[in-house]
Amino acid sequence: MLADTPDVDGPARKARFQPEERSDEGVLDDGSVGLPVARMGLEHEFFLVDRSGEPRDLADQFLRECWEAARAEGLDPRCFKAESVMGMVEITTPPTYSVGEMTAHYLDNLGLALGVAAELGLALYPLGAYPLPLRPVIREDPGYAVRASIIGQDRFLHAGRCAGAHLHLELPAGTVWPDVKAALCAPVTAQRELLGLYNLATALDPALVALSRTCPFYQGSTDGFAARTVHYRGILGFEGLYMGMHEVGGLSAYASRVEDLVDQQSSRYTAWFAAMDRAGVERRLFAQAGGNLHRASWNPVRLSHHGTVEIRTMDANFPEMVLAICALIRAAAERVRRERLEVRPGRGVLALEPDGDLLHVPTFSYVNGELLCAAVTSGLLDRRVEAYVDSVVRFASPYLERSELVAPLGTSGNYKNTESEILATIPHRGASLTRDQGLSLVREACCRMDEQVYSLLRRYGGVPPGDQHDPGVARVVYIRESPIILAEGMQPAGADEEQATAREADKALA
């Protein structure tokens, strides 16, 4: 059962990944090692626009209609959420056990939202930035008011100009407490999985930036950078949302032990309180607005109160690109989990390099420096970035659940992203957009969004019976009186067998 818990980023409510629903790992009767099925969840932020492409601050009316329609259709109303500004909404999935199940829930919810929008004369603009000048209206909420006062009213508006897609990967039970503290007392195997997934997500950051780039225009102009990334993180000299506040808005370093995550959280809190003091905001206001460790973290990779590692790197995008990138991330994460790989940074490493029980990754200074800079400038056209994406795809491929979903990303030597497709459609483009060009871009994106959703619904809509997890029919193997729930039809495989299969695939793909 899903617990109805507050969304610490705002007034919306979310379903928590309940730790008691995931069992610990154990040794099976044949000596092989089984793992419980780790869940995932997806969040996609959208701009509300009218049929001409103009932004509309009608989130509350739209959400009321979505909630009513969801109840009528047997969908979860909690999957339709408010955001920090009145012209943006978030559509999510409940916790799901497979890419197929997540895809079906995502598409069903998008289909409902598109129908509601059409009835209201609205559309959902799906990309990471609105292309024309936009001054969003901040939602009246104590949490947002405090945050805007700390960051600055004008800078906080970037939060309403940037839309993202976030993927949650479930962590072992007991590794992250509800107040988002990393648990030092968790079992060693659980801590290792936590560190592996967190470090993998950190290493993936520049590849995900490059693959997910969408709208090249921000406030009516383009400068060749990944617009949402530089304006949200406030990097490379841009006066963005978290400029000068790397601890709370930038990519954090790898963690070699759980204590490192605790130290990062402490530094984040300290930096946030220092920013409050500089802004003259009383600390009691933060506490009164429900302040906790989660409310002081908007990093691209963070531990979530849902008991997940949340990957927030990606631009909001067309559904097929969102699903493609999520399928790629899930496959990489499953390989780390099932092979129990230690993700270890090393000097001279420029790509993901599996080696026995290790996954070698570049140093953090390279990932968050040279490689990230390349990802937000030349992007996929940069040879370093392309080689890095190659290594990510090669590493993840053996564990892809639905290989057809990643086809929109292209292949080695011809990777694709939405940004390059948009730029190719704009004739005689300069550094700025005319208003007509911008509105046309928005309308075309909304139209493409609709077409993709209904096309994908025909293929994947409705939770497939084979993917819908029902504990009542799942096969349960009892190990020392502790149940391990395996996906229906899944045979428990030993770690050695999985490693051998993946390594053979690596050789074939090399």
Residue ranges and their predicted role:
Residues L2-A104, L112, V116, H158, ...:
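C-terminal accessory/tail domains of diverse enzymes
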Residues P77-A165:
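Well-ordered mid-protein domain cores that form the structural environment of catalytic cofactors
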Residues G121, V209, R337-L341:
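Secondary-structure transition/hinge residues
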Residues Y125-R135, P142-A165, L169, G174-Q264:
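Metal-dependent DNA replication initiation modules
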